[in-house]
Amino acid sequence: MLSINNKLKNLKLSTVKNLYNKSSSISIILVNNNNNNNNNNNNNNNNNNNNNNNNNNFISLSTTNLFNQKLCIESYKKVNYCKKKGGGNKNNDDNDNEKNEKNEKKVKNEKKEKNEKNDGNEKVEIVEDNDLIVPLSKELLQFDKPSNKRKDWPLNSEVVIYPSNSVNFIGTTGPINLGFQFITRLVPNASGKTFLGFFLCKDAYRNNNNQIGRTIDSIHNVGVLAQVTLSPSGIYHFETIKRIRIKEVQNGQFPFIASIEPLSNDERELKDPRIAELMTKINVLSLEYRKLYPDVYTINSVDFENQIEVIDNPDYYLAAVINYYGLNYPDECQKILETQSVVKRLEMLYHMILNEQPLLALQQKIAKDLDDKTTAYKNKLLLTEQLKKLKALLGNETDEKEKTIEKYQNKLSELTLISESSKKVIQDEIYKISTIDPSSSEYSALKNYLEWLTNLPWGIYSADYFDLKHSKMVLDSDHYGLEDIKQRILEFISVGHIKGTVQGKILCFIGPPGTGKTSIAKSIAKALKKEFFRFSVGGLFDESEIKGHRRTYVGSMPGKIIQALKITQTSNPVILIDEIDKIGKRNHGDPSSALLEVLDPEQNVSFVDHYLDTPYDLSKVLFICTANSGQDIPAALSDRMEIIRLPGYVEEEQIEIVKNFIIPKTFIDCGIKLDQLSISDDVIKQIVKFYSREVGIRELEKLIEKIMRKTALKLVNGTAERVDLTLDNLEQYLGIPSYTSDRYYDVTPIGVVNGLAYTKKGGATLYIESTSEEIQKPLSSLPPSQQQQNQLEPSIKTTGNLGDVMSESSTIAYTFAKNFLYELDPNNTFFSNHNIHLHSPQGNIPKDGPSAGVTMVTSLLSLALNEPVQNNLGMTGEVTITGKVITIGGVKEKTIAAKRSGLTSVIFPINNRINFEELPTYIKNDIDVTYANDYKDVFEVAFPNKKYLLNNLKTF
C-alpha cells in the first residue's frame, strides 16, 4: 500500500512530483529542499524555514496510463487519482508496453541525477502498493490512514456562482472574462486554489443581460466546479473538475456565494459494461457520420477519431463528444449534467447525436450544392477561355477587347464636331483600355467612361425655329393669361430671328404653386421646337448631382446637366431647373455654387463636369428656373437670371381656366361624355369663389375631378343617365363651401385695420388689431419719492407670430404714432397712460415683411383717437420714423386679395403707381386707389371725420 510516513510532514517541501505508468503502481515522490543553507545551520533557522516552507507544499499527478496526450492532456495532469496496477486497457499493444518501460527508466534516471546534483539535499522515498487508490491533496500531508476520501476542497466549501448561457462539462477549459464584481469575490481556499461554480441560466433569463443571474431562481441548481487561474498576461482561465449542486445561498446580493456539495459517480456503476458499450456505439456512430457527411466534418476529424478511442473516463468523454459535434442545446445538455447515472448520461448523449442526423444531412446538402456550383462555375470559366483561344487560333472571331476598342474608335470617328482637347482625351482612354486586362475592375470603369464620352452630342445642335405665329399659337393654346411671360418669349424669338441664332438664356419664373411655371417652360420648348429636360434641385445637398462624381469613386457618374445632354442628344435643349429656391446648403458642399458655374454665361462656355473632366459648351442651352419666392434664391444666382414673376390668377382668370382648360381635360381623363354632364357658368363661379382660395389652379382641378368621380358613380350605378350641376345640388358633390369671406368684420371696429400682404401662395388680407390697458397710478398716500418709483412706464406688446422685420416695424409705428398724435392733439395723453397690445390673427402662421408699417400706425391712432377706420379700406406700405411711406412689392397680388375680400378702396405708396397702372383692366376695375407720399395722406383717407386735426401738424 502506498502510504505517506509521518516524517513527510516535517520535510521542507517546495515541489512534489508523482510520476507513474500503467504497468506498475510505483510512485516516485521527489522531495526538493529549496533551502540553500548548509545542514549545519542552527536549529532556530531550521525551524523558521520549516514554518515558511510548509505553506508552499503541493502535489501534481500525471495519469498518462488513462488518456492519450493528444486530447485534454493538460486537464488530466491535474486529476488526483491513479489506478491499480493493470487497471488500464487490457488490449494495450506491445508499443504501449515499450513506452511504459522507457518511462520507468526515465524516471529512475531523473531520480539519480537529482540525488547527485543536490548532494544529498534531496530526499527520495519509493513506496509501492497494488491495492488502493491514494487521495492526493493538501490534506494528504495531515493523515496517515490511506482510507481517507479525496478532498480537494471541504464538502461544505463555499464558491462564487457564475451564471452562464451554456453548459460546461468536466474537462472543459478556456479563457473567461470576469467582471470586477466577480474578481473581488474570488478568494483562494485553504489549499491556495481559486474556484468558481458554473451554473446554466434558465431559458427565460438566458438572453437578457439585465436579468442574467440576478436572482438565484434564474439559474439551475446543478453545475460544475471550475478552478480559476490567472495567466502572466492577465487573462483568467478556467478548468472544470467536478459536478456540484447548490446546497444553500450564503448571501442575497449578486454575485451570489453558495455552499455546494459534490455529485460523484457511483464507483460500482463505473464497472458497468454498458458504459464501454455505449462509448463504443457513440464512436462507431461518429465514424459513420464522418463517412456519410464528409463535407461537414473535415477539420481535425482524424485527431478526434484517435482521441475518442483512448478516452475511458465518461465525464471527459462527454465533454469531448459534445464539443466536437457542437451540440448547442442548453436545456438538453443541462439534463445530461443533472443526471446522476453515468449510463443514462451516455444514453442521452447517444440519442442526442442520433437526432443530429437530419441537421447533418441538411448541412451536407448545402455544402455539396455550394461545391457543385463552384465546380460548375470553374468548368464554365475554363471552357469559355478554351473556346476563346480556339477561335482566336482559327481566326473565326476577334477578341472581345479588340471589338470594344474598334467600337469606340468608330464612334470617335463619327464625332466630327468635337473639340481637339476632348478628342485627345478619348484617344488616350482608348489606348489605356487596350493595355488593361478585361477582367480587372479598372477595365469596366474605363469602359463606362468611354461610353459617356462617345455618346454625348458633341457639337450637335437642333435647328432654331423662329416662327412668331406658331410660337404665339402654342403659348395661347396651353395657357390663359400670363401675358408678360408670353411677351418675353416672343421678344426672345424675335432677337434670334434677327441674329440668325439663339444664344442661351437663363429665365427664372417666380410665383405661387399652381400658377403654371413648369407647364409654361414645356410650352416654350414646344414653341421653339427644342428638346425638353426637367430636374428638381429642391432639398439637394450634394453638389455632385450638378457637377458629377469624380471617377475615383465606385459607381461614379456625371451630373444632371451632362445626363440631360445625353438623353436629349442635342447641345441646345431647354433645361428646366425646378424649385431653385429650395436648394440645400451645407458646410461640406454648396450646390448653389456649383449651379452658378452652370448658369453663368461667362463660365458655362467651358463647363467641366467632375466625371468627364473635359470642357463642354453649355452656352446654347436655354435654362429656365422656377421658384415660389425670390427671397430664398441665393443672391449670386438671382443676379445672373432674368426674373419673371407669375402673380397668380384673379377670379375672372380662374373661371376662364376652369371653363376652357380644366373641364375639357377632366372629361377626357374620366371618360365622361359631354352629354352626360353639364356645368353652368354660375356653378363654376361659385366653385372659384367659395371652394378655393389659392391663386393657382391645382385645388380647382381637384374639385372638378371630385365632381367627375361622383358623376361617374351615378352613371355606373344607374341612378342617373345625365347629371346637371346647379347651384342647388352643388353641395351634394362638393359639400359645404370651405370659404365664405376673407373679411372678419363687416363694420370695422376701433383699433382694427385691414392690411394687405404678399405670401408664397399669393396675396392675402392681414388684419392688425390693437387694444389698450390703462396704467394703474400709485396711491396718493405714498410719499412723492415712492410714487415716482412705483410709476409704471407705458409699453407695447406684440403677438401673432410676427417676424423680426414686423417686430421692428411695430416699434417704429409705436414711436411715430406717439409723436404724430402729440402734434395732432397735444391734450391727448392716451399713449402716456396706457399699455398697448398689438396683435395679428392666425398666430399659427408666421408673418414677416416690410409692408405693414402704415397699417400698424393706423391701428394705434384709431385706438388713441377712439375713431374706427373707414369701412372697405385696405392698405399696405412701410412707414419711416419720420412718416415717409416707402415702396412695397406684390401690388398685383395684393390688389387681387383686396378684390377677393370685397374691399373697394386701397392705399398704395406713391412709388407703386406704375405697378398698379400696368395691371389689366379687369383687375383694376371697382378699386379706388389712393397713393400716399407720407402718412398724413393715409390719415386723411382712413379717418375722414378727423381730417381737421391735420391743420395742427407742423413737423409731419
From Swiss-Prot:
Extra facts: This protein may be expected to contain an N-terminal transit peptide but none has been predicted.
Organism lineage string: Eukaryota, Amoebozoa, Evosea, Eumycetozoa, Dictyostelia
One GO cellular component term: mitochondrial matrix
PROSITE patterns: LON_N, LON_PROTEOLYTIC, LON_SER
Composition bias type Low complexity, residue spans: 777-795
Catalytic activity from the UniProt record: Hydrolysis of proteins in presence of ATP
A Pfam cross-reference name: Lon_lid
Entry annotation: catalytic residues: 851, 894
SMART domains (UniProt xref): AAA, LON
Subunit structure: Homohexamer or homoheptamer. Organized in a ring with a central cavity.
Positions with a binding annotation for ATP: 511-518
Mitochondrion keyword on record: yes
Residues covered by the Lon proteolytic domain: 747-945
First-listed, main subcellular location of the protein, grouped into a coarse class: mitochondrion
SUPFAM superfamilies listed in its UniProt record: P-loop containing nucleoside triphosphate hydrolases, Ribosomal protein S5 domain 2-like
Domain Lon N-terminal: 159-357
GO molecular function: ATP binding; ATP hydrolysis activity; ATP-dependent peptidase activity; sequence-specific DNA binding; serine-type endopeptidase activity; single-stranded DNA binding
Subcellular location: Mitochondrion matrix
Cited function: ATP-dependent serine protease that mediates the selective degradation of misfolded, unassembled or oxidatively damaged polypeptides as well as certain short-lived regulatory proteins in the mitochondrial matrix. May also have a chaperone function in the assembly of inner membrane protein complexes. Participates in the regulation of mitochondrial gene expression and in the maintenance of the integrity of the mitochondrial genome. Binds to mitochondrial DNA in a site-specific manner.
UniProt-listed InterPro entries: AAA+_ATPase, ATPase_AAA_core, Lon_bac/euk-typ, Lon_lid, Lon_proteolytic, Lon_Prtase, Lon_prtase_N, Lonm_euk
Protein name stated in the entry: Lon protease homolog, mitochondrial 1
Region Disordered, residue ranges: 37-57, 83-123, 777-800
Family per record: Belongs to the peptidase S16 family.
Alphabetized UniProt keyword annotations: ATP-binding, DNA-binding, Hydrolase, Mitochondrion, Nucleotide-binding, Protease, Serine protease
One BP annotation, GO: oxidation-dependent protein catabolic process
Annotated Basic and acidic residues bias: 91-123
Enzyme Commission identifier(s): 3.4.21.53
